[in-house]
Amino acid sequence: MINELEKIFRQSHLDIVESFKNLESSNKAKLVLDKWKRPEGGGGTTFTIHGGNFFDNCAVNFSSIKGKRLPKAALGNSLIKSSNNGYQAMGVSVISHPKNPYVPSSHMNIRLFCILEKNGDVKEWWAGGGYDLTPFFPYKEDCLQWHNDAKDLLDTYNKNFYKKFAKNCNEYF
């Protein structure tokens, strides 16, 4: 199961990278792909664009790390307090700053934490993520569409999610 989930995360990363590369039609942009390894286990890929026609700066990151014990900060109420058999955590994050001030900056991330059994199977897991836009020149129509699209997506999982998450967001910000 965990290998299939990692494939999905990796493919999401690659799809976003390809979409962003297609927005940069000239050779003006500096595109950098950096693959890295973590000594304790796992690694990831960081893709950045600097000084392009569309993006001033952006980053699309993938990571999948493994370890023997989760850091205390990761042991929230939704996870068992012991990860004696190890863990695996993975995620994709995107940060974009377009050149056009009428196109909002954006951020999104998806993440998955798994506590493992002795045989490597998933014992318990926690998933999360979020996304936001920061418009410099907000348009009411764009804001409404963004919220409507978020609601439509969340409604496919639970009709109460949008109201709950919007409330959490408004309290946080």
What are these regions (language model features)?
Residues 25, 29, 82, 112-116, ...:
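Solvent-exposed, non-transmembrane amphipathic alpha-helical segments
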Residues 1-80:
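Gly/Pro-rich turn-and-neighbor structural signature
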Residues 120-173:
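Long, contiguous internal "core" modules enriched in hydrophobic/ aromatic residues
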Residues 15-18, 22-26, 101, 115-119, ...:
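Secondary-structure boundary elements
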Residues 34, 101, 129-131:
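Flexible, active-site-adjacent loop/turn segments at secondary-structure boundaries
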Residues 46-126:
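Internal mixed beta-strand/loop scaffold within catalytic domains of large alpha/beta enzymes
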